[in-house]
């Protein structure tokens, strides 16, 4: 595997939206224990995936609580191929701040970096405050995939990371495979629209 086979992916978003839980659920689903997640203990984890018969190493970076202190710097974004912008579906403020995170990607990220909007904690249906159709509309305007996940139950977690990997593959390697995502917990899959 050479450097071109490594995709650097960042998890960003407000504190306590579940970024570390998503990372741990994806990279080690058999040993995931929600109570064991320590928000300041993870820098990055690796996971190998296959796209079109080719193996890629996803190097997934977590902010490890730095976002609470607004200490995320341009060095964190350096070399990133993709960014999962996460919010908590039960916390409207975390969704409202997504635009600020998108601005930060624009300010510090590589031109053309792939992005996926992720609404986490979709298992908390009775506490949900952010309507998926609003988030989908915003993602459509940006021309990026949107997906709701639950790190607790594992719903759509792998799909979110694979949508990110597919976006990177298409944008940076030249693959033609469109991202197919199941945006909302329990909804049928859909192909990402191309927005002009």
Swiss-Prot record:
Coiled coil residues, start to end: none
Superkingdom, natural source: Eukaryota
Keywords: Cell membrane, GTP-binding, Lipoprotein, Membrane, Nucleotide-binding, Prenylation
Topology in the lipid bilayer: Lipid-anchor
Binding site for GTP: 13-20, 62-66, 120-123
Lipidation sites (S-geranylgeranyl cysteine): 196
Entries under InterPro entries matching the protein: P-loop_NTPase, Rab, Small_GTP-bd, Small_GTPase
MF (Gene Ontology): GTP binding; GTPase activity
Main location: membrane
Positions of short motif Effector region: 36-44
Keyword Lipoprotein tagged: yes
GO-annotated cellular components: lipid droplet; plasma membrane
Subcellular location: Cell membrane
Family: Belongs to the small GTPase superfamily. Rab family.
UniProt name for this protein: Ras-related protein RabG1
């Amino acid at each position: 595997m050479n450097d071109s086979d490594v995709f650097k992916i960042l998890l960003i978003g407000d504190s306590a939206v579940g970024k570390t839980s998503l990372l741990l659920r994806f990279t080690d689903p058999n040993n995931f224990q929600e109570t064991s997640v320590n928000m300041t203990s993870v820098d990055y984890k690796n996971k190998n995936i296959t796209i079109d018969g080719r193996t890629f190493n996803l190097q997934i970076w977590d902010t490890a609580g730095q976002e609470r202190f607004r200490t995320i710097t341009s060095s964190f974004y350096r070399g990133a191929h993709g960014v999962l912008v996460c919010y908590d579906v039960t916390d409207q403020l975390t969704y409202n701040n997504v635009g600020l995170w998108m601005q930060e990607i624009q300010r510090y990220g590589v031109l053309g970096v792939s992005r996926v909007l992720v609404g986490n904690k979709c298992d908390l249906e009775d506490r949900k405050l952010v309507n998926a159709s609003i988030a989908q509309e915003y993602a459509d305007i940006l021309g990026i995939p949107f997906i709701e996940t639950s790190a607790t139950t594992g719903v759509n977690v792998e799909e979110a990371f694979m949508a990110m990997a597919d976006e990177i593959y298409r944008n940076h390697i030249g693959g033609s495979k469109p991202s197919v995502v199941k945006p909302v917990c329990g909804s049928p899959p859909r192909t990402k629209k191309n927005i002009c």
